[in-house]
């Protein structure tokens, strides 16, 4: 692994600054980082972390409280463009995998130590193979398994809210 460090974001101003940068990026989900929307979500985050390499923020994401003792890890994951995996660059010039190597293990340990059940999700059925691969690559001690169905993680009228779920238990209240 590269020499990266996870740091907690404790101030809303720093978080919103990162969201503003992400919302202006070419990230496919840039609209998900809208500052006004993220400001409204701030109080539902139990922890927000960033991945740092030197002075550079590589990525950020949070642990979002879904209620009923359930949290979503790597919520609103943002990865800087040069660190994103691209199907055109299978050789991967940048071997840093923020979700797999850092955020999912760190945030899951943080949440399970506090008694929460965890999940993470990926949109659309066509990304199920990627979700299966990611779940297999995680350390077994984290306890993740890919659940058999698609689940509504937000407004079911929005097709992007129906997602593949990997969770630390088989039955989650979604």
Predicted feature residues:
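Short amphipathic alpha-helix that is part of the acyltransferase structural core
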Residues: 1-33
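Conserved GNAT acetyl-CoA-binding A-motif
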Residues: 109-125
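Conserved beta-strand-loop-alpha-helix junction that forms the acyl-donor binding cleft
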Residues: 120-136, 154
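Residue-level preference for hydrophobic side chains embedded in well-ordered alpha helices
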Residues: 15-18, 74, 99, 103
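C-terminal "cap" of GNAT-fold acetyltransferases
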Residues: 142-174
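Short glycine-aromatic motifs
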Residues: 4, 19, 44-46, 135-146
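A conserved beta-strand-loop-helix scaffold within acyl/acetyltransferase catalytic domains
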Residues: 20-81
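Conserved acetyl-CoA-binding loop-helix of GNAT-fold acetyltransferases
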Residues: 85-111
């Amino acid at each position: 692994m590269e020499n990266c460090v996870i740091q907690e974001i404790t101030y809303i101003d720093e978080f919103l600054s990162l969201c503003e940068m992400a919302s202006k990026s070419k990230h496919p989900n840039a609209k998900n980082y809208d500052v006004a929307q993220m400001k409204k979500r701030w109080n539902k985050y139990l922890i927000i972390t960033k991945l740092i390499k030197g002075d550079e923020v590589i990525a950020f994401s949070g642990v979002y409280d879904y209620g009923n003792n359930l949290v979503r890890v790597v919520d609103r994951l943002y990865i800087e463009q040069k660190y994103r995996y691209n199907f055109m660059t299978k050789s991967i010039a940048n071997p840093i995998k923020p979700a797999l190597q850092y955020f999912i293990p760190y945030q899951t340990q943080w949440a399970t130590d506090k008694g929460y059940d965890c999940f993470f999700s990926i949109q659309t059925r066509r990304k199920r193979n990627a979700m299966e691969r990611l779940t297999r690559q995680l350390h077994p001690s984290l306890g993740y398994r890919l659940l058999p169905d698609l689940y509504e993680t937000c407004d079911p009228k929005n097709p992007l809210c129906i997602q593949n779920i990997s969770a630390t238990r088989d039955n989650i209240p979604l």
